């Protein structure tokens, strides 16, 4: 046992008999409730307390949490499958859940054992929204910093116990450094700037802004933000690999985050296929109202094309997730780090999954007819939801450019170089 492992106490898991199969069945069983509450959740800006409690009860928030701190440590594929199921019921709820529930993994990988013990706490209850964009004004004080500022798009914050942020932090010696930090819920306020017409899509994703006002961040709650692309600078692994004895807690984040988006978008595409299929079975043909639209060859072809792209998106999402897990396992076996090229390979596969899923939703929306333009139409909601990915940084040209730069043996731009 490593010194780090011996320094941290263990917590019992809530349900020692939980299996991935039972977890996924519970997530799928939520689908009718999530669909019934879509309008309400979008107006509120996040899912209902009843859904939150159901996710707590089924153990969904603890999938990636290490066993030492009361989690199930079921792995990344179990997580993306759960995210997909929830997103199939309501894409915005899938986004909210995914980005509140996954950062226990980041905590378990990169913060020291004593901090993990403090933040997981005596019950192992930890959920954190995160923003990657650097922000805040930082003042050095005894033992840490006081930080103030507005951190927008903190998806999942209404159901979170903590907030992870990113800042350019002054250093006692040398230039400021890009770092991640954690604050507890009691030190922040949530701005009422999400839900309803505050956004075009993903209205129930809980992507409110977080405001910090002289929040205290102890030095030990700060870690360098150099774990997005590569573990090449971590030959001995991370706090997490040593503490938990699991190479999955290498925690290289950019590739992994892209897998989550693949799951959200694939779930959205499945939801759109479900809705379009129901429409074809119940709506009449415009010029032959004696027949349902399911007899219309063009609609049959559109459904088949969209379903094919949805199935491709699902296969690519799972392939990217398994590739990331294999890269972590390789480190455990051979000590071989995850390189920048490795991470961008995972990211690029996930991006193609997201692209295929978006195209599936968009073609179904275009083929559905004018009725889906009305407020409350599910296909309209799904169309608006995928546009939120289309404008997200994950879909922008920066990452293909970096992949091209590596192929040309050219340096990456800051802060990735």
Residue spans for each PLM region:
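Charge-rich, acidic-biased intrinsically disordered regions
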Residues: 51-54, 113, 289-297, 326-345, ...
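DPxDG-like acidic metal-binding loop motif
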Residues: 150-196
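Basic/polar N-terminal segments that are highly enriched at the extreme N-terminus
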Residues: 1-25, 29, 416-417
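C-terminal helix-coil-helix/basic helical segment that borders enzyme active sites and/or dimer interfaces
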Residues: 35, 39-42, 312-352, 365-368
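Glycine-rich phosphate/cofactor-binding loops in nucleotide/flavin-utilizing enzymes
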Residues: 368-417
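Glycine-rich flavin
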Residues: 47-57, 62-161, 173-176
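Generic structural signal for well-ordered, non-transmembrane alpha-helical segments
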Residues: 25-28, 267-270, 304-311, 347, ...
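Glycine-rich beta->alpha junctions and the first turn(s) of the following alpha-helix
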Residues: 209-310
